């Protein structure tokens, strides 16, 4: 798996704050477990399809990419690209710009559940290694 970076722009491709989104909140230097502390691994993402087929995606409409990313980094390193690969255009009415507090809370609860399941799996894996 590889996670890249992108640049935030307006509809006319003028840079918008915060500019480049490179997901430096988690890096190889701070370890795979740091991915459990963030609310997503970022975009864009690319997956090694043969491995992905052995893991599978959760059958949900939110957070499935995060769940798979956590599962992958349990055993494999995730590659990083810090240079922007594309521009992400933002404008008023963008679908992810105005989520209700109820939707944000539901999304966060689900991601907390994903982290809990992954943490439990890592504890089991480490116990079996002893």
Regions inferred by a protein language model and the residue ranges of each:
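Conserved donor NDP-sugar-binding/catalytic core segment of glycosyltransferases
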Residues: 1-18
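Intrinsic disorder/low-complexity detector
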Residues: 12-14, 96, 128
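Short, flexible, mixed-charge acidic loops at enzyme active sites
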Residues: 15-25, 101
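Conserved nucleotide-sugar donor-binding catalytic segment
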Residues: 28-115
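Non-catalytic N-terminal targeting/anchoring module and adjacent flexible stem/linker
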Residues: 122-130
